[in-house]
Amino acid sequence: MSVTLRTTVLVLLLLVAGLGHAKIYKWVDEHGKVHFSDRQDHSVKQEVVNVKPRASKWSRFDIRIETVDLELTAEENQQIVDGVNHVYEFFDRVLSFDMYRTVPVNILIFKDMVSYRNYLIQRDRGWAVASYGLYMPSEHQIVVYIQEDRERTFRTIKHEVSHAVVDTIVPYAPAWLNEGLAEQMEMLERDDSGLYFESHPENRWIVAKAREQGRLTGIDQFLKLPSNKWRHSDMSGSGSVRAQAGQFVYFLLAKPTRRSFLVRLMH
């Protein structure tokens, strides 16, 4: 996979799946039926379709953001709102879920790690004090803290929003898929052409290192791992299952046929 693979999400007639940098070809068969494909076929006369996507007007949810002992700039607040809505939009338009079913969550942001950890301990979530953020299903709440790298805080929020969505609409999803999607949502962005994913540099490095050291779990074994054992391995911090899950989902999202497999898996 390329370092900066961008998976653009567009809708073109029957092509509901997102389109990468590949061109879209159109041709008419002998019966007058119009076909579309992202693969060039030299046996038929094709023409390249120039897609001109409309600007997104996605604004279905009113995102509630609460801060404790800190103040976000207007730009940061908007960045959070946009990021959350991008995640909702992705699940709705690409993974074909009805996002009106999703329970909007409240986002609580603490000024530092100490305040964040104290809050978790007070709510019997002490097991998660080493995390960057946490989604609390019973309270429909995402809790994070401002990290030294503030951009990482905003990525963490998108990560936890993904968990909130999956918990609501696909509670039976295997742990690797739940976490893999959340890892990729961190890298979800939008430009004039639509939604796209950047590669996750940290996960790419971890997986490459594990492969180099012979510690990378085989994909068949990885997919068969029960969710409870997967979570135990992830929480122990001794493996690379989280990074591998993120990279595998990244791989699945890179091509229309793989995305179709992912959609079927989740439905």
Which residues does each predicted region cover?
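Bacterial N-terminal signal peptides that target proteins for export
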Residues: 1-9
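Bacterial N-terminal signal peptides
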Residues: 8-17
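Short, cationic interaction patches enriched in Lys/Arg with P/S/T/G and frequent prolines
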Residues: 19-86
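Conserved beta-strand and immediately adjacent loop positions that scaffold enzyme active sites
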Residues: 24, 106, 181
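Short, solvent-exposed loop/turn and secondary-structure capping segments
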Residues: 38, 118-121, 194-196, 264
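Juxtacatalytic substrate-recognition/specificity segment
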Residues: 59-174
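Acidic/His/Gly-enriched intrinsically disordered linker/tail segments
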Residues: 129-139, 172-267
